[in-house]
Swiss-Prot record:
Protein name: Early growth response protein 1-B
Chief place where the protein resides: nucleus
Compartments (UniProt record): Nucleus; Cytoplasm
Stored Pfam families: DUF3432, DUF3446, zf-C2H2
GO molecular function: DNA-binding transcription factor activity; DNA-binding transcription factor activity, RNA polymerase II-specific; double-stranded methylated DNA binding; hemi-methylated DNA-binding; promoter-specific chromatin binding; RNA polymerase II cis-regulatory region sequence-specific DNA binding; sequence-specific DNA binding; zinc ion binding
Zn-finger (C2H2-type) residues: 284-308, 314-336, 342-364
Ranges of Low complexity composition bias in the record: 111-140
One Gene Ontology cellular component: nucleus
Keyword Transcription regulation tagged: yes
Organism the protein comes from: Xenopus laevis (African clawed frog)
Gene name of this polypeptide: egr1-b
Annotated site residue numbers, Interaction with DNA: 282, 293, 297, 303, 321, 325, 349, 353, 359
Function as written in the Swiss-Prot or TrEMBL entry: Transcriptional regulator. Recognizes and binds to the DNA sequence 5'-GCG(T/G)GGGCG-3'(EGR-site) in the promoter region of target genes. Binds double-stranded target DNA, irrespective of the cytosine methylation status. Regulates the transcription of numerous target genes, and thereby plays an important role in regulating the response to growth factors, DNA damage, and ischemia. Plays a role in the regulation of cell survival, proliferation and cell death. Mediates responses to ischemia and hypoxia; regulates the expression of proteins that are involved in inflammatory processes.
TM stretches of this protein: none
Domain of life: Eukaryota
């Protein structure tokens, strides 16, 4: 059951005529206001006497009129609401003012053996006796059936109005029989029992407007029930249709990969370079028009398409960074954990990624190539020195035949000084000097000249013996 609330302005020190005029509110129009000309004592403000709701107006005792001291009026402004009590033995509010208002608005079934209505004199006598004792009393309204609380309420020009015109209200019972001091008040067995709690306004920001829209012949609680049973702003069929359409759109995007391209297509670094795998063995082609990549597996194509779409489904749990490939995420996590499973075979240095180790290994290979290049010139120089004696020994015979006469004429003096024999000394020492000159010009190093001096001299000595007759004839 929903709650209905209303604003009421009550003056607890002026209640001589409690039903003369109620303040108008959106839901309680034309109800009498608690207003009177006589005042209570400030000690009697904490407890109110019991009053009856008969067809006649309750007359207060004349002793209240003797008070001439007028206390400042206290105004209580609050918001009261109605809700059904969970059981018939629920307690009222501890303040007598709330008890009075709950008695005015609350409803309860009365048994068939309820007491008859009391006269005005008995009401005034009971109220005087109650005010002299000043006990906290409660008041209640009993009816035979549950009817609309706020039905079409007419104005009350006379002093004995009917609060609920749809049914005949029963008066209050006598204080000695029906009035039970608080706490707890005992209610008769009833079908429905209500009490008036005090609920702040901010809990129901739209409730007052909803109650004001309810017609006079309709229960406000029924209106609240209807409001809670209204369908949502978006029908369920519309939500299902939207969800179906969204799923279809996602399938279309996943099948074509062209409707939602976030990043422009990236050109290949070497577009004309042929792939190792033939095209007929790579059936999965990239659907982007400007990309001619083909793949042999579907997962490779899916991973490649993430480059075009910008999708990064793999997220690091530590730094919340996203990656498009799972292996990138794995290597990234190693930066947090410090794991380095790849070690260099040469120097033992460890790396977190295999490509880093591969790049590091190339450094060692380049160093080996440089060392090999430095060792190559030394190995080439040694065969030249070993080959030169054979060259000198292979050319002794043509030299004396071709250059014998000019050399002898050019260099006569050193030959005579070196060799005493005139015939042999004239020709062959000159050949020796000529051959030495050629060797010096060809090999400027002093080591080469020293290495060739001894074989040439030995060769000339042999040649002098062999060709001595011929040389004599030429001379």
């Amino acid at each position: 059951m929903a709650l209905a609330k209303t604003d009421m302005l009550v003056s607890p020190l002026q209640i001589s005529d409690p039903f003369s005029s109620f303040p108008h509110s959106p839901t309680m129009d034309n109800y009498p206001k608690l207003d009177g000309a006589e005042q209570f004592d400030h000690h009697a403000a904490d407890a109110f006497s019991e009053m009856s709701l008969s067809n006649e107006k309750a007359v207060l005792e004349s002793s209240y009129a003797n008070h001439t001291t007028r206390l400042p009026s206290l105004t209580y402004t609050g918001r009261f609401s109605l809700e059904p009590a969970p059981n018939s033995s629920n307690t009222l509010w501890p303040e007598p003012l709330f008890s009075l208002v709950s008695g005015l608005v609350g409803m309860a079934n009365v048994s068939s053996s309820s007491a008859p209505s009391s006269s005005p004199s008995s009401s005034s006598s009971s109220s005087s006796s109650s005010s002299s004792q000043s006990p906290p009393l409660s008041c209640s309204v009993q009816s035979n059936e549950s009817s609309p609380i706020y039905s079409a309420a007419p104005t009350f020009p006379n002093s004995s109005p009917e609060m609920f015109p749809d049914h005949s209200p029963q008066p209050f019972q006598n204080a000695s029989t029906a009035s039970i001091p608080y706490p707890p008040p005992a209610y008769p067995v009833s079908k429905t029992t209500f009490q008036v709690p005090m609920i702040p306004d901010y809990l129901f920001p739209q409730q007052q407007g909803d109650v004001s829209l309810v017609s006079a012949d309709q229960k406000p609680f029924q209106a609240m029930e209807n409001r809670t049973q209204q369908p949502s702003l978006t029908p369920l069929s519309t939500i299902k249709a939207f969800a179906t359409q969204t799923s279809q759109d996602l399938k279309t995007i996943n099948s074509t990969y062209q409707s939602q391209i976030i990043k422009p297509s990236r050109m290949r670094k070497y577009p004309n370079r042929p792939s190792k795998t033939p095209p007929h063995e790579r059936p999965y082609a990239c659907p982007v028009e400007s990309c001619d990549r083909r793949f042999s597996r579907s997962d490779e194509l899916t991973r490649h398409i993430r480059i075009h779409t910008g999708q990064k489904p793999f997220q690091c749990r530590i730094c919340m960074r996203n990656f498009s490939r799972s292996d990138h995420l794995t290597t990234h996590i190693r930066t947090h954990t410090g794991e380095k499973p790849f070690a260099c075979d040469i120097c033992g240095r460890k790396f977190a990624r295999s490509d880093e180790r591969k790049r590091h290994t190339k450094i060692h290979l380049r160093q080996k190539d440089k060392k090999a290049d430095k060792a190559t010139p030394v190995s080439i120089a040694s065969p030249v020195s070993a080959y030169s004696p054979s060259a000198s020994t292979s050319y002794p015979s043509p030299v004396p035949t071709s250059y014998s006469s000019p050399v002898s004429s050019c260099y006569p003096s050193p030959v005579h000084s070196s060799f005493p024999s005139p015939t042999t000394a004239v020709t062959y020492p000159s050949v020796t000097s000529t051959f030495q000159t050629q060797c010096i010009t060809s090999f400027p190093s002093s080591i080469v000249t020293n290495s060739y001096s001894s074989p040439v001299s030995s060769a000339l000595s042999d040649m002098s013996v062999t060709y001595s007759p011929r040389t004599i004839e030429i001379c």
